[in-house]
Structure formats: structure tokens, C-alpha cells
């Protein structure tokens, strides 16, 4: 049974926390169950924190709960220390940390709701997929 290694865009994490319906939430459950490996860098963890703290009211969580969630993700994740040698590839600079992490950590997948933003990363052999497509892949592999 393959254990896929994936980078999760912030929009997937947010969607999974916003609603218990849908593939994003199911992916978070399968992550906790050890069915796939989240790849994480300091930059991506910081992005997660910024978005979750900014959206805490919408998500219905306190800053303390946000901190606990991020701590849990860090424990579950495979941490990557990235080089400073990265040439921007993407039209949106906010997406670069995810592309950098996926490329340098040799991720199997980059999971996002914005596939078209990551088109250049596909040329590096990274499969850029929706949460639903990744969920189907993880379920088929377990």
C-alpha cells in the first residue's frame, strides 16, 4: 500500500476546516489516520498559521485552538528544510512556497483547489490535483 507524500495548499486546509462535507475534510481525517504524508516547510506552516488566525472567526476557532491544530499538523507532517536556491515559476508569488516545497521534497502530489495556478510545476513531475482526485487516489491505495 503506497503512502503518498503531498503538499496541501492552504485553500484545501481552510476548506477542510470550514466544512465537514467534502473531500478536503476527508483528507484531513485520512491524514490523522496515517493514510498519507503531509509535507511541510517553515514557510508553508507560517502561511497556514496566518490564514487560520485571520479566518478564526469564520472557522469558529479560538487562537489557542488554531495553535493546537497547527501543532498537530507539525507532528503529523514530514518537515522539509528548503534551500534558498529557488527561481519563481508561478504567476502568483503567494503560491511559490507550495511549489518550492513540492519540488524540493519530491512530493508525489500538490493538492489544491487552484490547479491552473500550478501549471509550471507539472513540468517537474509533480501531480497537481484537486482534493477529490487525491482523496480517490489515497482511498484506492489503502
How would you describe each model-predicted region?
Residues 1-40:
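Short, well-structured N-terminal submotif of metal-dependent ribonuclease cores
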Residues 30-85:
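PIN-domain endoribonuclease scaffold, especially VapC-family toxins
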Residues 10, 42-43, 113-115:
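Short secondary-structure boundary segments
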Residues 15-16, 85-91:
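Short, flexible loop segments at the rims of nucleotide/cofactor-binding pockets, characterized by
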Amino acid at each position: 500500500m503506497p503512502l503518498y507524500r503531498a503538499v496541501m495548499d492552504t485553500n484545501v486546509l481552510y476548506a477542510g476546516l470550514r466544512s465537514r462535507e467534502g473531500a478536503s475534510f476527508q483528507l484531513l481525517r485520512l491524514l490523522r489516520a496515517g493514510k498519507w504524508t503531509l509535507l511541510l516547510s517553515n514557510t508553508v506552516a507560517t502561511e497556514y498559521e496566518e490564514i487560520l488566525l485571520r479566518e478564526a472567526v469564520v472557522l469558529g476557532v479560538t487562537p489557542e485552538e488554531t495553535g493546537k491544530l497547527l501543532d498537530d499538523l507539525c507532528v503529523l507532517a514530514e518537515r522539509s528544510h528548503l534551500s534558498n536556491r529557488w527561481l519563481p515559476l508561478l504567476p502568483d508569488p503567494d503560491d511559490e512556497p507550495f511549489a518550492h516545497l513540492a519540488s524540493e521534497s519530491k512530493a508525489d502530489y500538490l493538492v489544491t483547489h487552484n490547479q491552473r495556478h500550478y501549471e509550471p510545476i507539472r513540468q517537474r513531475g509533480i501531480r497537481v490535483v484537486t482534493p477529490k482526485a487525491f482523496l480517490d487516489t489515497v482511498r484506492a491505495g489503502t
